[in-house]
C-alpha cells in the first residue's frame, strides 16, 4: 500500500511539473471555455504552475474548462523524450477570479503566469453555435429585404385587396351569387391564406432583426395592420352578415394602406442605394483629387530640381542633353484632370 501511495504521489508530482501536462484549479466555476496563453508565448516559454522560478518551453495555447483548468500541450514530435521530473511541491496553485457583470467579456487581472484571458459568453455556452445563428439571421435579413421578396409581397397584397373587394361586392349584392355557391367561402379562404403568409413574414422579420423592427414605427404599424386583418378574417367566420359587411370595409382600407406602404418602402430602399452609390463616387473623386494634388507637387519639385541641375551644367560648360518639352507634361496633367472630373 505504501508503495502504491508513493507511486501515486510521484505520478501526481510528475504531472504538476511535466512540461506536457499542467493542472490549475479555480475556486469559482466559470460560464464558458476560456483560452489562456502564456505570458512568454511570443518567445516560446511557459512557466510551470507549481513554480515561478523555472520556465518550461511550450508552443501550445492553454485551455481553461468550467470547473478546472486542464492544460494539455503536445510536442510537434510525438517521439520526443520527456525530461526527468524534478522534486517540487505538489500543492496545487489556487487562482481566485471574480466574474464581472457589466460586460459579456471576462477581464483577467493578476493571473501571474498568464498574459491574457479571452472568451465570449454565449447563451448556451457554445460560441460556434451563436456565430452560426448570427450568420443565419444575417442571411434571413438579406433575403427578406431583397427585391424579389418585395415584389412577391406587393403581388400578394394587391391580390388580397382584390379578394376583399370581391367579398365586399358579393355582400353588397353588386355581384349576385346563387344561394349555395361556394364562391364567397373560396375568396375568404384565399384571403385568409395570404394573411397567414403575411403573419409568417412578420415573424421572420422579428427573428432576423428584432431591434430594427422595434425601432421603426412603420414596421410595427404594418405588423399591427396584418394582425388586425388576420383577426378580423377569423372573426368573419363566426359573425352575421351585417357585422361582416362593416368588417370587410375595414379590411379594404387596411389592405390598401399596406399596398402604399410597401411601394413606399421599395422607393425608399432604391433611393437609399442610389444615395450610397453617389456617396461612394464622391469619396473616390475626393481621393483622386488628392492624388492629383500630390502628383502636382511632385511634378513641381521635379521641375525645380531639373532647373537647378541645368544651372549647374551651364556653370560647368556642359552641354544640356535634349529633354522632353515641359508642355508635354502639362498636356498629360490636363488630360488626367479632365478624366477625373468626368
Swiss-Prot record:
Gene3D superfamilies linked: 1.20.5.170, Voltage-gated potassium channels. Chain C
Annotated region (Disordered), positions in chain: 1-20, 74-102
Subcellular location(s) per record: Membrane; Cell membrane
Coiled-coil features, chain-numbered ranges: 271-315
Activation and inhibition: Less sensitive to zinc ions as compared to the mammalian homologs.
Annotated Polar residues bias: 86-102
Keyword list, A-Z: Cell membrane, Coiled coil, Ion channel, Ion transport, Membrane, Transmembrane, Transmembrane helix, Transport, Voltage-gated channel
Chief subcellular location: membrane
GO biological process: cellular response to pH; cellular response to zinc ion; proton transmembrane transport
Keyword Thylakoid: no
GO CC, alphabetical: monoatomic ion channel complex; plasma membrane
Membrane topology: Multi-pass membrane protein
Membrane spanning stretches: 149-169, 186-208, 218-238, 248-268
Segments on the Cytoplasmic side according to the record's topology features: 1-148, 209-217, 269-342
One Pfam family of this chain: Ion_trans
Residues in the Extracellular compartment per record: 170-185, 239-247
GO MF annotations, alphabetized: voltage-gated proton channel activity
Record's comment describing the protein's domains: The segment S4 is probably the voltage-sensor and is characterized by a series of positively charged amino acids at every third position. Unlike other voltage-gated ion channels it lacks the pore domain. The C-terminal coiled coil region mediates homodimerization.
Function: Mediates the voltage-dependent proton permeability of excitable membranes. Forms a proton-selective channel through which protons may pass in accordance with their electrochemical gradient.
Self-association state and partner proteins as the record states: Homodimer.
Family: Belongs to the hydrogen channel family.
Protein name (database record): Voltage-gated hydrogen channel 1
Phylogenetic classification of the source organism: Eukaryota, Metazoa, Chordata, Tunicata, Ascidiacea
